Amino acid sequence: MTSLLITGYKAFEIGISTEKDMRIKIIKEAAKRDLIRFLEDGVDWLVFMGNLGFESWVLDLANELKKDYEFQTATIFLFENQGENWNEANQAKLAAFKQADFVKYAYPTYQNPSQFRDYNQFVIQNTDGAYLFYDEEQETKLKYLYQEMKKQEQYFIKKLTFDDLNEVAENFSGN
C-alpha cells in the first residue's frame, strides 16, 4: 500500500467549535500513533480531500512527521472554489491544504449531485486504502464514501473510532 486517503468527521459534526478543545489533542494523539504505523509500513502518499476537522488535524500532524519520515501529501479538492467563504482562521487551514506536494481539483464548480458520487469513486480508485475517523453509530454524509470503500475488494480501511479515542484519553498526559 502506497497511498492512503485521509478523511473523517468535520469539527462541527462531533461538537467541536474551537481549536482549543481538548478532544482535538486526543484525536491528534490517536492519529499520530496510527500515521507512524502507516508510514513505517511503507505508505508514501497521504491524500486529503481538503475538509476541516479531522483532515486538517491530520494534515498538521503529517507536516510535523515530514521531519522524520519520507512521504508526500496530496489534496484533491472537490471544487476549485472549496473554502472560499470560510472565515480567516479556516482560510489558513485551506492554505495549508493548498501547500501539499500535489494539489488537484475534481471540478471547477458545482453543477449536479452526481459530482459527489463520481468524486468519491475517483478518490477511492486513486488510493490503496483509507484512514477514516468515522463511526456508523454517528452517521454523516461520510457514510456514502464509506459505503463505496467497503464495496472495493482489495481496499484497505482503518477506522479511528470513538472507542479508540476513549482508550487514548485514558492514557493521555496532555503534553
UniProtKB/Swiss-Prot annotation:
Sequence intervals crossing the membrane: none
Superkingdom is: Bacteria
Q: Which HAMAP family match?
A: UPF0398
Q: Which PANTHER family match?
A: UPF0398 PROTEIN SPR0331, UPF0398 PROTEIN YPSA
Which family does the similarity line name? Belongs to the UPF0398 family.
| NCBIfam families on file | PRK13660.1 (NF010181)
Q: What is this protein called?
A: UPF0398 protein SSA_1858
What is the species listed in this Swiss-Prot or TrEMBL entry?
Streptococcus sanguinis (strain SK36)
Its taxonomic placement starts with: Bacteria, Bacillati, Bacillota, Bacilli, Lactobacillales
